[in-house]
From Swiss-Prot:
Entries under InterPro entries matching the protein: AlkB-like, AlkB_hom8_N, AlkB_tRNA_MeTrf/Diox, ALKBH8_RRM, Methyltransf_11, Nucleotide-bd_a/b_plait_sf, Oxoglu/Fe-dep_dioxygenase_dom, RBD_domain_sf
The reaction(s) this protein catalyses: 5-(carboxymethyl)uridine(34) in tRNA + S-adenosyl-L-methionine = 5-(2-methoxy-2-oxoethyl)uridine(34) in tRNA + S-adenosyl-L-homocysteine
GO molecular function: 2-oxoglutarate-dependent dioxygenase activity; iron ion binding; S-adenosylmethionine-dependent methyltransferase activity; tRNA (5-carboxymethyluridine(34)-5-O)-methyltransferase activity; tRNA (uridine) methyltransferase activity; tRNA binding; zinc ion binding
Cofactor (UniProt): Fe(2+)
Domain Fe2OG dioxygenase: residue ranges: 220-337
Protein name: tRNA (carboxymethyluridine(34)-5-O)-methyltransferase ALKBH8
Domain RRM: 43-120
Amino acid sequence: MDSNHQSNYKLSKTEKKFLRKQIKAKHTLLRHEGIETVSYATQSLVVANGGLGNGVSRNQLLPVLEKCGLVDALLMPPNKPYSFARYRTTEESKRAYVTLNGKEVVDDLGQKITLYLNFVEKVQWKELRPQALPPGLMVVEEIISSEEEKMLLESVDWTEDTDNQNSQKSLKHRRVKHFGYEFHYENNNVDKDKPLSGGLPDICESFLEKWLRKGYIKHKPDQMTINQYEPGQGIPAHIDTHSAFEDEIVSLSLGSEIVMDFKHPDGIAVPVMLPRRSLLVMTGESRYLWTHGITCRKFDTVQASESLKSGIITSDVGDLTLSKRGLRTSFTFRKVRQTPCNCSYPLVCDSQRKETPPSFPESDKEASRLEQEYVHQVYEEIAGHFSSTRHTPWPHIVEFLKALPSGSIVADIGCGNGKYLGINKELYMIGCDRSQNLVDICRERQFQAFVCDALAVPVRSGSCDACISIAVIHHFATAERRVAALQEIVRLLRPGGKALIYVWAMEQEYNKQKSKYLRGNRNSQGKKEEMNSDTSVQRSLVEQMRDMGSRDSASSVPRINDSQEGGCNSRQVSNSKLPVHVNRTSFYSQDVLVPWHLKGNPDKGKPVEPFGPIGSQDPSPVFHRYYHVFREGELEGACRTVSDVRILQSYYDQGNWCVILQKA
């Protein structure tokens, strides 16, 4: 049904429903992806719902499209719910438009998906992936035979251990067995004084000797971890602890191929295919500097070519499809290090870092000290760069401000660079922030702002018609201080006054939708305004620290190695060190330190410079901000402890929990 001719005759109920969905698909593509459709016929079509991102493979879609004519090209961008088809002639594309619009196909999971087609004038897709493996990374194909693979898999006994010769655990996203030494996930290390009895299995001996002879490895391993992954399981991005193991990390893939994601601090991501029966060897930069992990999913985006070759996945969107994962078992071999690590990457090396991470605060005094060092001081340092990334107002906040009556007095508590102070010219808005440098930026923009603590705002009680607090309360380090911040906001409101509050959510994936924080494009150097409290950070490696002494006291904190159990369960951090979060990944603790990679000169008036090249030994300064990320219902629960207030609305907005309060 062509929407341009809908006025020529009366549409049926079914046709109207289809037309609404087709128009919605057009608007969604334009709004979220910038893809503009045209009203006239062309050779090219965009196929909404027909993409790798929603489980439709090239092998499924191409035969459907070819029923309408010769397809010159089928472009399927990775992780996108649409594809582009270019036919040989316009007549063939018109036939596909009429025939396939509204057609149901079954994806690889057996679910029905309806296709919506629209014409496009130009098909362009910017390739961003590099075409080289991380330095020091090697993949050796067919390292063992299929018979040897079967023998190794059959040697693994997943029944509970009774002889304590190896340690077995069932983690949320995989099963593991340790040999030689047990890997302790609570501290991401091994106890070098307590080797497991039995050593490595005898069956591995001949393989290790062969790899040594052929020069694939230089050290004979004395520790092995067997991981078993069901389809849909994975392991978070991490770096194996420097001080725990020698340079080589060696992994043998059995049972099924897999795509492993490698990420450099500069934000470059390299997906690497590990074929069945292949050997992955990580040394040097790839072992010490790049994170590696396996995304939890049931299908991998791979090359459509017949042979699944090892190495980087092609960036050619005309040669991508989906590969269904099978049961994969990996044998990972390491050599336990007996001396401190002296690698060439001291900024990310736990042996060469000098300071220890802060502990979780156990008193109000400790919480105040933590906030001073890991919130207030950090924002003073990063104010210029932070402001350069905070320019696009969030739609729901704009909606709240524009709905207020003309002449309302509004306070923005924690106003940052003041991006909301000028949204509605009919309001009288004042802002306050703990950072002098951010307040100075507000004043440069001719906004009314002053420096103060959000727990003690020097404004008369009951004098505000409304307040907003955006991405502020999650910086307070105890529940009592977070409630006190809410009470201070309510104190400012007149009876009937409203407050809008945003905090960062622990649930960065909600209702089966990932937040923009998780989906963010690490490689794009253009527009980057995200909708959460740390979205300007593009670099996934979080353990980089500055060796610059007291000037960056917030940056000398080691990270938690995310090779521990997956999932989003909050860890008990009382009486323990605060973990450092991996940027653009799910949260594993509610109380975390989040890295900020300072780009260019931190001075406000100077331009921001790009990151240095891969392998640079002078990475950008890294600061760490304290956050308490809120679980679902936690913000509402805190609000209910405040007297004389009721919750008008609560909602989730792109990785944030939000409430609108009204003072009684």
